[in-house]
Amino acid sequence: MSDDVLLSISDLSVEYDVDPPVQAVQHVSLELHKGEVLGLAGESGCGKTTLAYAVQRLLKPPAVITSGTTVLHERDGDVLINDLNVDQMRAFRWDKASMVFQGAMNALNPVSNIGKQLADVFTTHRPDMSKSEIRKECGELLDIVGVGADRIRSFPHELSGGMRQRVMIAMALALKPTLMIMDEPTTALDVLVQREILTQITELRHKFGFSVIFITHDLPLLLEISDRIAIMRHGRIIETNTARNIYFHPQQDYTKRLLSSFPSLTGDRSEFSYGTAGLDNDSPDGEGGERE
């Protein structure tokens, strides 16, 4: 394994223990390099979010990890995430690996100002910090993400959707993790705000050197921000390549269909595709069950 690998996912499978069982993630193996943005693309229900939750061990019943290992390669040694106990896992999240959740801008506590919510991250994970140090850190974080330290006493309802999303990114950045998982971080934002958020993520990644797993069904968006892209379908990774090669030289028919499903501003209109790509008859297991 290369020295620049930060995260290794090996043969990871997740099953929803219902009747009949649903194989949400099937034998996924991926590597994330240090300082890299790895895009994870696929239609809704293909298993992207389930995979992200499995990495962070945030799955709730009836979801069960049935096989595989996830390892974070740190300077001071490897962390086998599967083997961490509850307290170790609680300390691991946000400190080593943080996550910006889908619909995160609506996850802020409406009756608490954003400064207090940011401070909670430090009081939980950095109990030795003084109140003045925490307040200074919170103000600096708000400046870094473009909200401004002067909004530290603002409540979520006083901020736009884009600003609330920036606050969530500030929380994810707070403890300077080496890994950040972003699950549809620009959902429900207009295209101009989306562009600003993407530009900011790129700048922050270069500034702080963290690695990103960026999850979305929007393949054109991933082509702009990602170094490499993994295409997911029916719970499996079917293709992984550089963003450039995914665009110019896709290997799988499904990848080609994903690319062609987005309209172009120029050129001829492509043929209409009948049916739903994720529910057709050519799935690996003959079924196209819904996955999160």
Protein language model regions, located:
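A short, surface-exposed alpha-helical micro-motif characterized by mixed small hydrophobic
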Residues: 222-224
